[in-house]
A protein has these predicted regions:
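Inter-helical turn/loop segments and adjacent helix faces that build the functional surface
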Residues: 30-38, 128-132, 201
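Short histidine-centered catalytic/ligand-binding loop motif
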Residues: 40-47, 123, 133-138, 199, ...
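Surface-exposed helix-capping loop/turn segments at secondary-structure junctions
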Residues: 57-67, 153, 220-226
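Aromatic- and glycine-enriched beta-alpha-beta binding-site module
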Residues: 81-140
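Compact, glycine/acidic-enriched structural inserts
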Residues: 114-172
Length: 226
């Protein structure tokens, strides 16, 4: 996983291409060293380098927000994990704090896989103790939190969703009941199949614009990093 140096500059991402999709399906169907080495130039030119360029464009949004890391994954699996397949089937970009385990903390992300792309905000598995802290924070100023939710959903045009407790926690007011039911997998995510809109620099503009609208939500949950 490569870190992105945050330097101010021009837009670097020029877009993916149909060959990107061909490689992603190819590695899914032929996940072995011989096939990968034969197609390594395709990986570098059509998948890794464009993803790294998009990561650098995203990093520019965080130049004035110290403490955020922008990471770009690589295709090679960690051999220490003893996975039966040597290569991943997707690449992703992740914006997060310098934390021990990403899944317990909020992040902004972009992912490209054989079926398409996804990007947005995700908070996969917050600790129960952290969710309790979040509920207390919400209760301190419900109007401020509800405004954050409304503003985010209005700006993005998408709902903020979450995995719910089977038995929701008791909320101090009716307006907070939906949020006291949150257990994890809190997200606001765009899913797109590959199309002409994927191939070109406009994708980078679209991704950066969407992630920028999610920064206030991301900042709120970053108060509870572990």
């Amino acid at each position: 996983m490569a870190g992105i140096t945050q330097k101010e500059g021009s837009v670097l991402f020029e877009g993916y291409c149909p060959e990107t999709v061909d490689f992603l399906w190819g590695i899914r169907m032929n996940n072995n060293r011989d096939w990968f080495l034969e197609h390594k130039k395709d990986y570098v030119n059509h998948l890794y380098e464009p993803t790294k360029a998009l990561g650098k464009d995203i990093a520019q949004m965080f130049l004035d927000k110290p403490g955020n890391l922008v990471k770009v994954s690589r295709i090679y699996r960690d051999a220490r994990l003893h996975h039966p397949l040597p290569y991943k089937e997707s690449l992703w970009i992740c914006v997060r704090q310098d934390v021990e385990w990403w899944a317990e903390n909020p992040c902004l992300y972009f992912e490209i896989r054989p079926e398409g792309i996804s990007y947005g905000f995700f908070y996969y598995r917050p600790r129960p103790s952290v969710m309790e802290q979040i509920r207390k924070k919400i209760a301190e100023n419900p109007k401020k939190f509800l405004k954050l939710i409304r503003d985010t959903e209005k700006a993005t045009g998408l709902p903020i969703t979450a995995e719910l407790y089977k038995r929701p926690k008791e909320a101090p007011t009716k307006s907070l009941e939906p949020f006291y039911a949150w257990k994890g997998q809190i997200g606001c995510v765009v899913d797109e199949e590959f199309s002409e809109n994927t191939f070109g620099p406009e994708l980078g503009v679209r991704v950066c614009d969407f992630l920028k609208k999610l920064i206030p939500l991301y900042d709120f949950f970053n108060q509870f990093c572990v």
